[in-house]
Amino acid sequence: MTKKIMIVDDEPDIRSTVKTILEKEGYVVVTAENGDDCLSKLDKEKPDLVLMDIMMPGTPVRLVVPKIKTKVAYLSVVRTTEAEKDNLLQSKNVVAFIQKPFDIKELVRQVKKILA
């Protein structure tokens, strides 16, 4: 069965680029522009993985993630300390922390590992 991924990022270029990359890998990909948009689409889309930027306008990500029942991997453009990463990874459904800018091959490798 084909896995579905939701990309949640307020940057249209990031959403578009990651969507194209993952679709070429055979995944079904849907997008959301922020946490609120993500929450409104979750019931309908039922993704196997949510790739979510940690810095977006709207409801803070730390309040959105607990409402997501599926696996979540954070995408971060900001430099974060190990303590900050540990804090972000506290939610039981958070499975990875991917630093932006990311290497395309590494992103694909991480996604495949998470969804294996």
Please place each PLM-identified region on the residue numbering.
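Conserved sequence signature across two-component system core domains
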Residues: 8-9, 32, 50
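Helix N-cap/capping motif at the beta->alpha junctions
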Residues: 31-40, 61
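Conserved acidic segment of CheY-like receiver
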Residues: 2-12, 18
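Receiver (REC) domain active-site loop signature in two-component systems and cognate sites
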Residues: 56
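Hydrophobic/aromatic residues positioned on beta-strands within the core alpha/beta folds
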Residues: 75-77
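Alpha4 helix (beta4-alpha4-beta5 surface) of REC/receiver domains from two-component response regulators
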Residues: 62-63, 79-98, 105, 109
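Active-site residues of response regulator receiver
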Residues: 53
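Charged docking surfaces used in two-component/phosphorelay signaling
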Residues: 16-24
